[in-house]
Amino acid sequence: MCPCPYMHQAKPQQWHDAKLDFAESMSYGDYLGLDKVLDAQVPRSQQHNEMLFIIQHQASELWMKLLLHELRHARQLIDQGQLAGSHRVLARVLRIMEQMVSSWAILATLSPMEFISFRSDLGNASGFQSYQYREIEFIFGNKNRAMLLPHQHTPQIAKNLEQCLHTPSLYDAIIQQMTRQDLPICALRLDADPSEPTRSDASVEAAWVQVYRQPERYWDLYQLGEKLMDIEDAFRQWRFRHVTVVERVIGFKKGTGGTEGVEYLRKMLGTVLFPELWSLRSSL
């Protein structure tokens, strides 16, 4: 038999000018660490739908990681007085949050019986214990020392959250910048303990009223105010979609983390991150 004429030809090294041999160079998968990322989904049950549940939450944690990355950068820019530079960063923050809101639609395809089939395998694991989510809340000013307790078994995470608890919030940083534009803020507000949750302050509202009445004069602050409104709007939508999906999937059962489930999540809907930005509307 005649040997195949192509048998001894060298393997192609390119295809349409694309490099094909990565034996000695970095590939797409290498750069992204996909071996680790795609090996991180380890279902505890044999149920088909547990993979959806795991990937939904892991993907959310990745978006939260990016969200924190951008929020820290925005706060740094604001601390440096680069308000205009922070606008683009906060615009990205908003898009990330919109992505997180839309992702609830995927988890909503999980039926009650599909979730029940593997719920017991979660043990006490709950999104309530997400330390990245907690840090996001802290950066937004919703501080709560009790929320450090679920992380005492992981010292480095507990240390990071403790530091975040005592670091001025994004909103605190903006209020400090208001004083640099000769907007009077009460000393008690400026010297407030950063580990305490944001509380409404009359002097802050009065300052925001001036900003909104003269947007051309305080354009950078006005833009920051509107971006914070957009972000809190998206955050409320995220919370609401969370409540809706949980009620749709488990009804009013207790959460795996021990909370009252839907009832607890409904209470959280009342949280206001930037109170004066909402109340000023009534004062204009």
UniProtKB/Swiss-Prot annotation:
It catalyses: L-tryptophan + O2 = N-formyl-L-kynurenine. It comes from the Bacteria. Keywords: Dioxygenase, Heme, Iron, Metal-binding, Oxidoreductase, Tryptophan catabolism. Heme binds at H242. Belongs to the tryptophan 2,3-dioxygenase family. Heme-dependent dioxygenase that catalyzes the oxidative cleavage of the L-tryptophan (L-Trp) pyrrole ring and converts L-tryptophan to N-formyl-L-kynurenine. Catalyzes the oxidative cleavage of the indole moiety. Required for synthesis of the siderophore quinolobactin. This is Tryptophan 2,3-dioxygenase. It comes from Pseudomonas fluorescens.
